[in-house]
Amino acid sequence: MIASPLAPAALGGADWEVDFYSRPVLEADGRKRWEVLICSTPVVCSPEATETDSPEPFRFEKRCSADTVNSQWLRDAFAEALELARVEGYLSPRRLRCWRGSMRAMVQRAAEALGLEVLPSRRCFALLDWLGERERDLYPAQEGYMAGPFALPPQPQRAVPLPWPEVVRGDRWNWAMLPLGDLLEAPDWGIGFGALLPIPHHLPPQACVPGIRLFSRQRALAIAGWLAGLEPVRLEMEQGQLILEAGLDDRWRLATLPENEAAAAGEAFARARAEAGGLQFLAVQIADGESHFEGFWMLRDLPDG
């Protein structure tokens, strides 16, 4: 079984989420500011956990001049972050998640020089939240802030969904809803592969999170293990198809709904997802009624979704 955020200390500390990119602030030389942001993936614990069980996530930020944007500078920044984490009592990360495809090669070179594994993945929800806070509250208050409006960058073309491999196809699947109050107890559930997410405090406990459950008596564990390697991100309904988005830009066709069901199902899922603050889930079990999950992932909408 691979390690997951459900047991972050199994092979080391929590994963780190990394963004190395330009910001909407002009420096004195007239060029855009660059900076690296690093935060650890939050450890999700049960409601009864103490502060020792769920420490504050590690954060690191460092500015970079535009003429030193390279893997050497980034390697040194990673080394500085590792030392700071050690001093503050954090374990070294198991992996670095990088969500910008355009910076993947540079992050990879810098990380490999320090023996760190890089995982291209959009499961950088904590980092995206932090970046959103900075774009909303920090950068606009700084000298040199580039106030809009700007032309929006071209949106990357979405990949054509790949068919779900037959070897990991389950017996059946169904839609499901989980009350937030129940989901808060997820750290105490019996879960094999998977990853949880912190639940926003502003959501009422009676709100329900939509998702799907995959069932397979013979292949549940294999399906869950395969999904773990995909880095599931979110579910989408598109032209009557149920799509799982995963990794950096992967898309998988889970099912094609009958035409007379697709529109209503898509509307119901979108409405429930919005009411749950964008949260969703994907579960893998041997059979309905089982209390153990071979796989369980909390998913979430992204800013582009």
Question: Which sequence ranges carry the predicted segments?
Answer:
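Secondary-structure boundary/capping micro-motif
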Residues: 1-305
